[in-house]
């Protein structure tokens, strides 16, 4: 097992993701790596965007697309610490609550 995959599995475990979800996320990452024939940490945001567009254009099932998208978002945001616009920004609940007060 690569150190990167081990790190993602640790991150998913810390996040409380179910075993089945973890397996689905790892499988989605394998498909991405196989598609580009290189490690996902070496891919650009544009390459990941094109990959997701390709899934849509091929007409994969909605659930398959969502698992792929969520697994990529988890990997790039949580494991690698990359906040890409592709996945949108998450609102900071504390900042939102403070602004409302």
Placement of each model-derived feature along the sequence:
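Intrinsically disordered, low-complexity and often Lys/Arg-enriched segments
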Residues: 1-2
């Amino acid at each position: 097992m690569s150190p990167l995959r081990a790190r993602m599995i640790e991150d998913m475990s810390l996040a409380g993701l179910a075993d089945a979800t973890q397996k689905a996320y790892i499988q989605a990452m394998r498909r991405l790596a196989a598609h580009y024939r290189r490690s996902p940490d070496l891919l650009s945001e544009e390459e990941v965007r094109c990959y997701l567009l390709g899934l849509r254009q091929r007409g994969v099932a909605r659930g398959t697309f969502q698992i792929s998208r969520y697994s990529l978002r988890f990997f790039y945001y949580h494991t690698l610490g990359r906040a890409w616009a592709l996945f949108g920004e998450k609102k900071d609940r504390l900042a939102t609550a403070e602004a409302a007060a």
